[in-house]
Amino acid sequence: MTPKLKPMDDLRRVMARLRGVDGCPWDLEQDHKSIRFNAVEEVYELVDAIEADDDVEMLEELGDLLLQVVFHAQIAEERGAFDFDRVAQGITEKLIRRHPHVFGTAKVKDVGGVWKQWDAIKQVEKTGKTNERKSAFDGIPRHLPALMRAHELVKKARNQGLLPKGRKCRAKRKLGEEMFRLVQKAQANGWQAEALLRVETKRCEKVLRKKEKARQLTPRA
């Protein structure tokens, strides 16, 4: 009798079987690029479940998202690149490294301090690597939706002191209404709000990168 495996081990075994010699024809045809957008779709379905406060759906969608991780790890293992254990080990070590105020002796005053520390450690980690990030903005995914990309750009710029902190807005609904009105205005003119924001975000990113570079070149007193 086959000993009962832990659920995670069981999932990995099933995935390996699907990709085996006598596995599923569809699974065998896939590679990293052919399924790259599946993870994006699963994330949005998970967000829907979270916003609906639906635990049953959330449980299922978390499983679907986990499948994408296991699928990519299996393909990578077949290529001799890395396996799931390396993925799990990597993120575990990263969490410990990036939280020295929890696992070490570092001190931070608030959430803002946590983010600054995170970015500083991240920059050190990337130094010397083939994909070394020379800018704080290099890590923003190009395929993020325009609004999410703009949000990340502003957040990183403020963490770097390249943009003012800005005033707090207590009227969350009012801000949402203003944003929706802008979408209506764009649609009335035959423009895609997503495309407009993407272009403007790209323009602002160029300006911020220039400011960042100029500051890096300025000798410190």
Residue positions per predicted region:
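Flexible "arm" and connector segments at domain edges
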Residues: 1-61, 67-221
